[in-house]
Swiss-Prot record:
GO molecular function annotation: RNA binding; structural constituent of ribosome
This protein's encoding gene: rpl30
SUPFAM superfamilies assigned to the protein according to its UniProt record, in alphabetical order: Ribosomal protein L30p/L7e (SSF55129)
Family under the similarity heading: Belongs to the universal ribosomal protein uL30 family.
Protein name as catalogued: Large ribosomal subunit protein uL30
Amino acid sequence: MVSLEEIPLIAIVRIRGRVNVKPEIRRTLEMLHLNRKFWATLVPLTDSYKGMIHRVKDYSTYGEIDGPTLLALLRERGELKMGGSLSDEWLSSNTDFSSIEELAEALLSKRVYLHKLGWIKPYFRLHPPKGGFKRPTKRAWNDGGELGYRGKEINTLIRRMI
């Protein structure tokens, strides 16, 4: 049995659009809160999510997110469900977290999950990457494209999209 600390936190970024997507893939993307192109989400790499990620690998890219990238993502692109952006002041007055750093640490240690927090949107709306994609967006990462598993390289892509 694998402990919760050993399960990595995975960032998934949708790269391809909504046209001509098979219904089962579209539904899986909706369950992952990836309804539009360039939206990102964070999930733990459990068996359930592994199957979902495998199903949407031809429409997204994913990898292990690190602390500084997660912190920048929450600061720049974190949105509240009632409107507005995520801030230290709002967190300290309305939640158990005193800062965005504390929230990022809780997400990385899997004490809380992004989709289970009722006050933050479970996705991040990103820009297209600065400088464009360096590889084709219709081929897998291992074949010289942008799709699928890319490991720690997801952090450089997300930083270019924030």
